[in-house]
A protein has these predicted regions:
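Cysteine-nucleophile amide-bond enzymes
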Residues: 1-273
C-alpha cells in the first residue's frame, strides 16, 4: 500500500503567501462586485456580495496555510486498493466525469469567477464511482493535491448536486490514464491555488481539478475540444461538447439527510463558439 504523507510545514519564506492570496482574492471579489454594480448586472453583484458577507473568502484564506503552490505536498494519496479497483474496471468501455455543485466556500469563490454553479470536476474508471479521483484542497487531514473522492463526500453539503457523464474509452486509453495516475501518486502533487488567479503552474503535477481532468483526457487522446489546460473550467467539458461525445448517466443530490439519484434531467447545452 502506498505511504500517505501529510502536508509538510510551510517554509517560513512562503508563510506570507497565504494572507497575500487571501487579500488578493478579497480585492478581486470586491472588484467584481463594483464592476457588476456599475454595469447594472444585479445578479452578479448580489452573488459577489454574498461571497463576501458569508465569509467565503475568509474561510478560504484561513485554509491557505495548508497549500503549497511551489512544491509537492501530497504523495501516496492513492492506495493499492484504489489501483486494484481501477484496474478491474479497465474493460468497462467508458471513463466517467462527475461535475459537482458543492456549495463550499472555495466553490462559491470559484463560481463567482467562472459564472457557473458547477465548480468541480472529477473522473472515475468505473460506473459505481468507486474510483473517483481529482485534484482538491484535501479533506479529513489529506494534503491538497491529487486525492481519491467519494460521491457522498462530493454531495455532503445541503443543496449540493453531482452530475455524472460517461465518455467512450478503450482499455488502452484507460491504461494510459491509470499509468499517469501512478506516476503522479509516486512523484507527488499539490493543488494549483495560484492557477485560479493567474494562468500558471509552477510544476507539472501542480494542478486544479479541471486542469487535471483535461490533461488526463488529452494524454489518452480522449479530449474533444482544444483549450489551454490552465483556462479550462469544469463546465467546459459539457458546454464544449459540440458533437455529443458525453452521455448523461445520473444526477445525485443531497437534501441534508439522504442522497438522491435521478437518471433523467435536461442536459446543459453547448455554448462555446
Amino acid at each position: 500500500m502506498s505511504e500517505r504523507k501529510q502536508a509538510p510545514e510551510t517554509p517560513w519564506y512562503l508563510r506570507p503567501f497565504g494572507p497575500l492570496v487571501s487579500l488578493a482574492l478579497l480585492c478581486v471579489v470586491w472588484g467584481v462586485y463594483g464592476k457588476a454594480r456599475l454595469s447594472g448586472r444585479r445578479t452578479r453583484a448580489q452573488r459577489a456580495w454574498q461571497v463576501v458577507s458569508q465569509g467565503c473568502v475568509y474561510d478560504l484564506g484561513r485554509d491557505l496555510t495548508r497549500h503549497n503552490c511551489f512544491r509537492y505536498c501530497n504523495r501516496g494519496s492513492l492506495s493499492s486498493a484504489y489501483f486494484a479497483q481501477a484496474t478491474a474496471a479497465l474493460s468497462d468501455g467508458y471513463i466517467y466525469l462527475a461535475l459537482t455543485h458543492s456549495n463550499s466556500p472555495a466553490g462559491e469563490v470559484i463560481g463567482l469567477f467562472t459564472g457557473r454553479a458547477y465548480n468541480h470536476i472529477s473522473l472515475a474508471f468505473d460506473r459505481a464511482l468507486k474510483t473517483l479521483v481529482s485534484y482538491n484542497g484535501g479533506e479529513g487531514g489529506e494534503a491538497p493535491g491529487l486525492n481519491p473522492e467519494t460521491l457522498k463526500g462530493l454531495a455532503e453539503r445541503k443543496g449540493a448536486s453531482v452530475r455524472v457523464y460517461r465518455l467512450v474509452a478503450t482499455r488502452h486509453q484507460k491504461q494510459i490514464m491509470l499509468k499517469r495516475l501512478r506516476k503522479i501518486n509516486q512523484e507527488g502533487s499539490a493543488y494549483n491555488l495560484l492557477g485560479l488567479l493567474f494562468p500558471m503552474s509552477c510544476q507539472p503535477n501542480i494542478m486544479f481539478c479541471s486542469q487535471f481532468v483535461y490533461a488526463m483526457l488529452r494524454l489518452a487522446g480522449l479530449h474533444y475540444f482544444r483549450k489551454n489546460p490552465l483556462q479550462v473550467r469544469p463546465t467546459d467539458f459539457v458546454e464544449w461538447d459540440r458533437r455529443g461525445r458525453l452521455a448523461f448517466v445520473a444526477e445525485f443530490t443531497f437534501d441534508g439527510v439522504c442522497l438522491h439519484c435521478q437518471d433523467s434531467i435536461p442536459q446543459m447545452r453547448p455554448t462555446a463558439g
